[in-house]
């Protein structure tokens, strides 16, 4: 079935997580952070630029880990993993999409999730808001999935 080296998943996850922290917080520009959720092409372009930079940092981190640790990572699996992660990151960072998901979950299976997403003042302290917590947990969940995908096809 699927082959996987048991060291690939944790090493790739650690690389993706570290790169995510750097790319999402240090390398994202102020303009991207403030404008990526804006409607129209301006917001889409700012979000895309952020995700391209972030994905490049993640690709570099996975490559360094693979080379330094001599890990048998399938390049096609790694590329697929990075693409899936990039798409999920773009989707969430457009903001209205993640908020709509929280609202839908709040109406159907997780009462209060939409209200949680609106906790705090994003302009005063964006890292202390419900939206930020949901955003980052979404990203980390997809890092997990990406690390698993990158582990496939290795025997």
Residue ranges and their predicted role:
Residues 1-155:
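Hydrophobic alpha-helical transmembrane segments
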């Amino acid at each position: 079935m699927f082959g996987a080296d048991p060291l690939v998943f944790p090493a790739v996850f650690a690389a993706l997580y570290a790169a995510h922290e750097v790319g999402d917080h240090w390398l994202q520009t102020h303009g991207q952070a403030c404008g990526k959720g804006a409607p129209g092409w301006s917001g889409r372009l700012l979000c895309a630029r952020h995700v391209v930079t972030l994905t490049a940092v993640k690709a570099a981190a996975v490559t360094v880990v693979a080379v330094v640790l001599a890990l048998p990572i399938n390049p096609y699996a790694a590329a697929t993993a990075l693409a899936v992660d990039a798409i999920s990151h773009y989707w969430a960072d457009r903001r209205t999409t993640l908020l709509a998901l929280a609202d839908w979950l709040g109406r159907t299976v997780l009462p209060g999730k939409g209200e949680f997403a609106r906790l705090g003042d994003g302009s005063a302290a964006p890292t202390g808001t419900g939206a930020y917590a949901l955003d980052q947990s979404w990203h980390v969940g997809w890092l997990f999935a990406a690390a698993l995908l990158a582990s496939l096809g290795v025997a």
